[in-house]
Amino acid sequence: MTEIVDIIAREILDSRGNPTVEVDVILEDGAFGRAAVPSGASTGAHEANEKRDGDKARYLGKGVQQAVDAVNGEIFDALSGVDAEDQRRVDNLMIELDGTPNKARLGANAILGVSLATAKAAAESAGLPLYKYVGGVNARVLPTPMMNIINGGAHADNPIDIQEFMILPTGAKDFREGLRMGAEIFHALKKALKDAGHNTNVGDEGGFAPNLASAEAALDFIVKAGEKAGYKAGDDFVLGLDVASTEFFKNGKYELEGEGKSLDPAAMVDYLAGLVAKFPILTIEDGMAEDDFDGWKLLTDTLGKKVQLVGDDLFVTNPKRLQMGLDKGLANSILVKVNQIGTLSETIDAVELAHRHGYTSVMSHRSGETEDSTIADLAVALNCGQIKTGSLARSDRTAKYNQLLRIQEMLDDQGVYAGRAALKGR
């Protein structure tokens, strides 16, 4: 009854106006699953391959018709009649069919769309919400949100070098209250920026992109906005950074052009340690470049006991890259982006490997998103304890927060808010 009888892919638009892949999977019993695939702006070199057509006469070369055709053609042929409840078999069949180490032939965007839509169809067939179908009875931890409220780097047209400045409402009693705290700080920040003469347009992920001279200026604005909203930084909420340092690592130096600094890896570690000393920053993502392993080791040895150090470009949700990091003692947390690896099964493997070794995990969106809220369910299903899905503006971001509100309602008194515990004693 749960055999796959139809798979339909189409080209839709993401939140940046670029095409992406959406997939419908239909089972023999009539159950239906739909998934839309996200896309990143700052991408790691070791990510699975997102297939784009390259035809400049169509969508400026960013079309995904080849990926759509792969789903409607060879992927459907390979999966027709396969049991959707056997997720690992579905995923492995697509990996084998692709035949490349990074899913370059069919495209990770094609494969992921089918993988997630299959899980959603199987969940519907079982009469379960996705978080419970994937995670079972232990899926009850509502994640602490990392809310990206000031954007810089590749996510904004401003001089700020660091890509994301985030708040984490760790002092909230539940997810609903944490979301409210975030929204109130967001609006207080908007007023503070406006009063100071800055623009309050929002970037790709819904955060503000003011022309501030330094990371310290951005952090200062956020702390003061929190106070205006009635919350104390360090108690009610803490701060997080996504440095995205691979983006400005050139010839062995970290080129902070906005701040006029050219730093070697040791100086970059000192720079980040200086920010941590001045502000209640408890999580830093991609503090060093993806292949600067010596820099990562120094950062981990310097800050790893008191700050969550998240590997995004470093690990690209890949169990093999994560194992390398575990062996070398790099970072202490993994960012989880389903489209970096390209299947649900491999995503689960990466999270489980991280948790087995005491690393934390953060479920994440991409800068190019859709209304699809699958990652909200997966954050709960995989007991990530943290989710990073943008600011408190733009429906492509709030779709995930709103789904978590629904999940909190479904879990009722069984649900637990991760809060500060998600940061493992930091």
UniProtKB/Swiss-Prot annotation:
SMART domains: Enolase_C, Enolase_N. Its cofactor is Mg(2+). The active site is at 205 (proton donor), 337 (proton acceptor). It catalyses: (2R)-2-phosphoglycerate = phosphoenolpyruvate + H2O. It comes from the Bacteria. Pathway: Carbohydrate degradation; glycolysis; pyruvate from D-glyceraldehyde 3-phosphate: step 4/5. Keywords: Cytoplasm, Glycolysis, Lyase, Magnesium, Metal-binding, Secreted. Coiled coil: none annotated. It is an enzyme of class 4 (lyase). It is found in: Cytoplasm; Secreted; Cell surface. Catalyzes the reversible conversion of 2-phosphoglycerate (2-PG) into phosphoenolpyruvate (PEP). It is essential for the degradation of carbohydrates via glycolysis. Belongs to the enolase family. This is Enolase. It comes from Caulobacter vibrioides (strain NA1000 / CB15N) (Caulobacter crescentus). The lineage of its organism: Bacteria, Pseudomonadati, Pseudomonadota, Alphaproteobacteria, Caulobacterales.
